[in-house]
């Protein structure tokens, strides 16, 4: 294989190509990855050949005893990620024998060696998705195959084992079904699912792990922001960078989030709610907090444009982002662009009265309206929620209608 270097492991092959190709090919790895032995390019020259996946049909279940069952908090007291359901899912992997049998067990602390790779080199990834209870009492997942695609891409980039996404979806349906009473009976709330994979090999060598653990925990959640559906204010400071070319900004790795916490605290000390991440000398917009960002412009002559940064390796390919773009293109009422957006363009649009709306998009909050951006000595005011029918609100309502089953849509996947 010219120009690449391959390392063969019993479980998969990872190949490194030139990380800065002149015209990089980007393909989406299917969520059904493990039924083929073909090598597939996934992103930025990284390739993965998966081993045989775990099987949902081999699931073992250990139910909680009555004394292990937890008291469920009132919906009004739910805080994001603080309470957890009665059960969890675990699947172990090692390089010699591959994936083990999936197990659903009572929720418990993890035990691992202090030299585990995850603790020293951040060999880790996670996903975020939700289960929703509709008025018909049916519980649904939202586009779970997209999370599986992204999880497999991140696994390959992290030198962690890939798997058959369809099998994990079946396991997610099963554990949600077992803990279904934890899915809130309220349309402002949902059950948050956190699939996670960590390298557990107990050695300090800087190399691919030969042992790993995939686990899933679940948490009932209310609205992500305590302020409700109200515009937030952002800190945009170009000296802080979240991601860079050739890096892993497009991957769902914990190492992308830990370094942002101190900057988030800086914003909060200034009375702001989130950080608007910029990149490069042009101060290009990338993400807001842990969300994708979208901007609605008035282009004049009755034309409007919904713009969002492109998937160029600096931002996460969000499921909500993809869903909003798909809806907007289906509506066909305004131009939809995936392109670079600079702060100079934002400043100019605001001065000309052409900056209509700015909002974040992500699983936790769906959409989050932005009312102001603090950028240097400027405070850019955005009338996101001041219009008679804000696009932000329309997106929020449209996604919620699908998630809670009020509108029938193939994105909504019943658990049974």
Show where each model-derived region lies.
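Short linear motifs centered on serine/threonine within intrinsically disordered regions
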Residues: 28-29
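Helix-start/capping segments and mature chain N-termini
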Residues: 2-20, 32-33, 38-175, 196, ...
